[in-house]
UniProtKB/Swiss-Prot annotation:
Family: Belongs to the selenophosphate synthase 1 family. Class I subfamily.
One GO CC term on file: cytoplasm
Catalytic activity, EC: 2.7.9.3
Organism: Nitratidesulfovibrio vulgaris (strain ATCC 29579 / DSM 644 / CCUG 34227 / NCIMB 8303 / VKM B-1760 / Hildenborough)
Protein's UniProt name: Selenide, water dikinase
Keyword Transferase assigned: yes
Residues the record lists as binding ATP: K18, D47, N48, E49, D67, D90, G138, H139, S140
Keywords: ATP-binding, Kinase, Magnesium, Metal-binding, Nucleotide-binding, Selenium, Selenocysteine, Transferase
Length: 351
């Protein structure tokens, strides 16, 4: 049997397949709120949080999330790892620890060999095990388009967690993975020259757990954090700025980029989701005239299994860096938070 490349079987790859933020916002605005939320829900859907935090008996809480997507790479085992790491990331972004997970699978079992699906599931299971969680089952349907991910339950202190609403003036912003996965995934899907190297780079970063960042949140009691996924760095920073009523300033020259990303963007290679992100955010963003427009595109590039944005009070920056170094986790200082004043943009991109 001739097997197509996995990335050729879907319209969009990874988190770039998300519904555009403007469309999603309109749809969700029509849904009523459950009046019981106040009894159980510590953190819900109001501020576009990464996951929900729900009280359970005994004064404890769980953190709940779900994430799945189409292939971002052609290697099935690597795809499983990346998809699982991406789903687990939401728990880490809140300051929780993954506890158990369920598989979510869509697969054309009558068209592709079963061992491809087995490799996807094996990649996911290995990543769940690395996170210290337990895989306890799942659900599958037959579908023309391959999709895989996890529903993850984590444990969390109901009095110590990070959200989009916790930004404070002076907070320093740390980013724990480089940008550009949306661009590289588009190159892989298109079979661009050198796409095999791009796939390796996607695997290197996409399969990396955000566990070290979660440890920083817990040990230092950070109030604000998120992970960078389908709405891009700019989109997720803007969510935090809006939820916290703050202004976020990004030093674009400090942003870490995956290899070849800038060159690929210069050729016009950018996923449709990235264009949608930039358009949706444009009314709340100020771009300094000296900032390269290609870098602005990358700021809004739709990421898959991206790093955490950690908002760290100035007096805790050294401690945060020490924890990340002890975990051998990469990080970059990319900006800071300021008070929101009249005429001040929510998101400022400066050289």
């Amino acid at each position: 049997m001739t097997v197509d490349r996995l990335t050729s079987r879907s319209r969009a790859a990874g988190u770039a397949a998300k519904i555009a933020p403007g469309d999603l916002e309109r749809i969700l605005a029509t849904l009523p709120r459950d009046p019981r939320e106040g009894e159980r829900v510590v953190v819900g859907t109001r501020d576009n949080e990464d996951a929900a935090i729900v009280r359970v008996p005994g004064g404890k809480a769980i953190v709940q999330t779900l994430d799945f997507f189409t292939p971002i790479v052609d290697d099935p085992y690597l795809f499983g790892q990346i998809a699982a790491a991406n789903a687990l990331s939401d728990v880490y972004a809140m300051g929780g620890e993954p506890w158990c997970a369920l598989n979510i699978v869509c697969f054309p079992v009558k068209e592709l060999p079963e061992d491809i699906l087995a490799d996807i599931l094996r990649g996911g299971a290995d990543k769940v095990r690395e996170a210290g969680a337990v895989l306890v089952g799942g659900h599958s349907i037959e579908d023309e388009s391959i999709k895989y991910g996890l529903s993850v339950t984590g444990i969390i202190d109901p009095d110590c967690y990070a959200t989009n609403t916790g930004l404070r003036p002076g907070d320093v912003l740390l980013l724990t993975k480089p940008l550009g996965s949306g661009v590289l995934a588009t190159a892989v899907k298109a079979g661009w020259d050198g796409f095999e190297a791009h796939e390796q780079e996607l695997g290197r970063w996409g399969a990396m757990l955000n566990r070290a960042g979660g440890r920083v949140i817990r040990e230092l009691g950070l109030a604000a954090a998120t992970d960078v996924t389908g709405f891009g760095l700019g989109g997720h920073l803007l969510e935090m700025a809006n939820a916290s009523n703050m202004s976020v300033h990004v030093d674009v020259s400090t942003l870490p980029l995956m290899p070849a990303v800038l060159d690929l963007v210069a050729t016009g290679l950018l996923p449709a989701g990235s264009h949608a992100n930039r358009h949706f955010c444009s009314g709340n963003v100020s771009v300094h005239p000296e900032v390269d427009s290609l870098l602005v595109d990358i700021v809004f590039d739709a990421q898959t299994s991206g790093g955490l944005i950690l908002a760290v009070p100035p007096h805790l920056v050294d401690d945060a860096c020490s924890i990340l170094r002890a975990e051998d986790a990469p990080f970059w200082r990319i900006g800071h938070v300021e008070e929101m004043g009249e005429g001040v943009p929510r998101l400022v991109l400066q050289p």
